A protein has these predicted regions:
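Methionine residue identity
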Residues: 1-2
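Bacterial N-terminal signal peptides that target proteins for export
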Residues: 5-19
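Bacterial N-terminal signal peptides
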Residues: 18-28
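Short coil/linker segments at helix-helix boundaries
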Residues: 33-50, 68-105, 111-143, 147, ...
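Helix-start (N-cap) detector for alpha-helical repeat units in TPR-like alpha-solenoids
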Residues: 62-63, 107-108, 152-154, 195-196
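Extended, low-polarity transmembrane helix blocks
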Residues: 143, 204-208, 255-258
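Amphipathic alpha-helical protein-interaction segments enriched in hydrophobic
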Residues: 154-158, 195-204
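Short, solvent-exposed mixed-charge patches
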Residues: 261-263
């Protein structure tokens, strides 16, 4: 997020996709990585069009609106064309804003407004507009957290933590170690059985060289892993599991590198 001022979700997602892509290159070659990305992108595009049609059939339906905004985000984060990414994000932003006129206290609308702001910032970076969007993202995630901190497995809380973790610190941006710790620990407490929350916290702790804290979080991740594999299943979770497995392996390797066991 240093030069392009990605949103929390965008910066995190781009990092994860890069790691997963590298893993696929190692174990299966470039063709495997490309094929996998094409599959995920095709699925996201199909869902985008389905959700768009559903939304257009009843634009005053609240669920239709935020689910379309979610589909806009999911599609935007996978496409490689910046113009296409920005266009999809703007559609998501418009759907959220339209919903918020009617329901200003809609947590999903504030949440996906922040997510799509992140995609728009990524598409337009580097620019002053992208830089300014960071504060919009922060505000919308905070509002979503105030309205429903449990939404999307503590998504608003987790993504605030990731925003503060990925962003440069003051005076350049909103980055803050203290706020990162506060929000990521809170997300891990609110939805402890969701792998993403434990992974985000562990990755931050490893960056800060916090041995005891990272060890505790990685043990918690190991404890919830078997149940998570049965709770988060199906096509919709394939991409997440591909990323989670690679990130868990990387976190374990980083822990061993930073804190080698005594001979």
């Amino acid at each position: 997020m240093m030069a392009t001022f990605y949103s929390s979700a965008q910066a995190m997602t781009k990092t994860k996709l890069a790691v997963v892509g590298l893993f696929l290159l190692i174990v299966g070659g470039a063709a495997a990585a490309e094929d996998q990305n094409k599959i995920f992108t095709a699925r996201a595009e199909k869902e985008f069009h389905r959700a768009q049609a559903q939304f257009q059939s009843a634009t005053n339906d609240s669920t239709n609106a935020w689910q379309f905004a979610r589909a806009c985000f999911d599609f935007s984060e996978l496409v490689t064309n910046a113009t296409q990414r920005a266009d999809s994000a703007r559609l998501g932003i418009a759907a959220c804003r339209q919903l918020l006129v009617r329901e200003p206290k809609s947590a999903p609308a504030h949440y996906y407004l922040a997510m799509n702001f992140g995609e728009l910032a990524d598409a337009e970076a580097p620019s002053i507009t992208a830089y300014k969007l960071v504060h919009e993202i922060e505000r919308e995630f905070k509002t979503a957290a105030e309205l429903d901190e449990h939404f999307d497995f503590a998504g608003p809380v987790r993504n605030l933590g990731q925003l503060y973790f990925q962003a440069p610190g003051w005076p350049l941006s909103v980055g803050s170690k203290h706020k990162t710790r506060e929000w990521l620990e809170r997300a891990a407490t609110l939805a402890p059985d969701y792998p993403e929350n434990q992974l985000c916290l562990a990755e931050a702790q490893l960056k800060w060289r916090q041995r005891d804290e990272a060890e505790k979080t990685l043990k918690k991740l190991a404890a919830i892993w078997p149940a998570a594999q049965t709770n988060f299943t199906g096509v919709a979770w394939e991409k997440s599991w591909g990323e989670w497995r690679v990130r868990r392996t990387a976190a374990q390797a980083e822990f061993q590198k930073l804190f080698p066991a005594a001979p």
